[in-house]
């Protein structure tokens, strides 16, 4: 059994406001992230993602950063982190992040018209973050070459689908009766 699948099946489940969440090192930073798990994930991303002509990897803060940093190191593709903090730099673009859990502003720097980007994130759940990010990247004039998320919470449609984008995923899961259930161990292509 691969490490990602095994780690998800062993993930602790917590209940918050009547909703069951799995707690995982990729999506939450706890429990401890083992290097062999991160390595496996990065190799799978590199094999699955469309990397031809990609100029930049774009990831929303915060939990996509460790994954995207490792992919950047392995591919020599520069990394842009979309931050929740405004810096006021020239060319900074704001976007609304509306998820099933919260609403906030995020800020894109260092992405320009004509850039070929790979969007990476840890989890695709409601799709709100990635729908907002893809809209901002479109407004900038960047070309979204591919979108890859490590884990998809397969609970139906999401805002990214509604925005007209498909994300590739490494594994698709649901939390059923207080346990993580693997829906598709190979994810979406």
From Swiss-Prot:
From the UniProt record, give one GO term of the biological process aspect: purine ribonucleoside salvage
* Entries under InterPro entries matching the protein: HGPRTase-like (IPR026597), PRibTrfase_dom (IPR000836), PRTase-like (IPR029057), Pur/Pyrimidine_PRTase (IPR050118)
Q: Which E.C. number(s) belong to this protein?
A: 2.4.2.-
PROSITE patterns noted in UniProt: PUR_PYR_PR_TRANSFER (PS00103)
Q: Which domain of life is it from?
A: Archaea
Question: Does the keyword section mention Transferase?
Answer: yes
Which SUPFAM superfamilies does this chain map to? Answer: PRTase-like
> Which terms are listed as keywords in the entry?
Purine salvage, Transferase
Q: State whether keyword Transferase applies.
A: yes
Question: Under the GO molecular function aspect, what terms does this record hold?
Answer: transferase activity
Give a short account of what the protein does. Answer: May catalyze a purine salvage reaction, the substrate is unknown.
Q: Which family does it belong to?
A: Belongs to the purine/pyrimidine phosphoribosyltransferase family. Archaeal HPRT subfamily.
* HAMAP family for this protein: Hypx_phosphoribosyltr (MF_01467)
Q: What is this protein called?
A: HGPRTase-like protein 2
Protein's organism? Haloarcula marismortui (strain ATCC 43049 / DSM 3752 / JCM 8966 / VKM B-1809) (Halobacterium marismortui)
The organism's taxonomy opens as:
Archaea, Methanobacteriati, Methanobacteriota, Stenosarchaea group, Halobacteria
